Amino acid sequence: MGKNRKALKKAEDTVVNDAQAAGQNVMDDAADGGKKKRDYTKSYFSYTMHEIWNHKMSYALIAPFFICFITFTLLPLIASAVLSFFYFDSLSWPQFIFWDNYVYLFVEDSLFLKAFSNTLYYAVIVGPVSYIASYFFAWFINQVPTKLRPIYTLAFYAPSLCSGIAMGVVWLVMFANDSQGYINSVLLNAGLITEPIQFLQDVKWIMPVIIIVALWSSLGAGFLSFVAGFTNVDKELYDAAMVDGITSRFQRLIYIDIPQTMPQLLFSAVLTITGSFTVGGLSQTLVGHPSPEDAGLTIMLHLGDYAGQRFEVGYASAIAVVLSVMVLGIGRLAFKLLQEKG
């Protein structure tokens, strides 16, 4: 009798285990959308082509983007990297000179070193400040009533719609070197200065002025991504946080908003770094090119000088490669740091 009972118990356990396994398989198939798992007997290429064919409509829809990306971004980058090892003046046949462009760039070209220091100075200030300001103002907009948010968003975002040249023209009036400039006029009337400040001619003022104008228009796509990120934060998290004793706005920012908007933080970091290292048109409009003692010279202006004025495409390509490596390296570092924090 005891043996029969054990056998019956074992049979019941087997049936239950089989049912659980079958149920798990059904759930796995449902989670996979009914798709078959990869057949590892096929080569990776065959499997890839098979998957592309099965999703041909999706690939057809994203094909225009990849075609434009390859044509206007990837191929020019490759061509620039190759031409950086040649002497090429756009007229004669390119001459292979190996590392000569890079040696001249870092050893003999004093203007590049000046442009490098100016660009780094600009990026170190504009990048972090605009990044933090974008997040702060997006958070501020999220605190105001819903009906007023579009108005505030447009007010903060509108300056970024202006091109660097257009902004420069407007701010030229503000920082004009004579008493007719708005800032000089206010300072003179207030008795704070006795003669106009040469904002656009004095070397010590040139880069600070460029930075101020750049920060005024720095709330761009990254700012909009932050606004969207705050909008998509699940409001139930705030209710749950109140139960746990998180009541102040600062606490909600630290424990809810920042973790929930981490994708936007990563996206904006890339945009901010790229934009802070590619300044050029704004500086040229405000202080001209060349600027007094090259105080407003940036890497982009130096690159444009060799590519568009001297037609030394090979050397300009070397400058572009160095700039690209800087942007990619710092962007990758920032991305990694934010991922670790998240």
What are these regions (language model features)?
Residues 51-342:
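A structural signal for multi-pass alpha-helical bundles of membrane permease subunits
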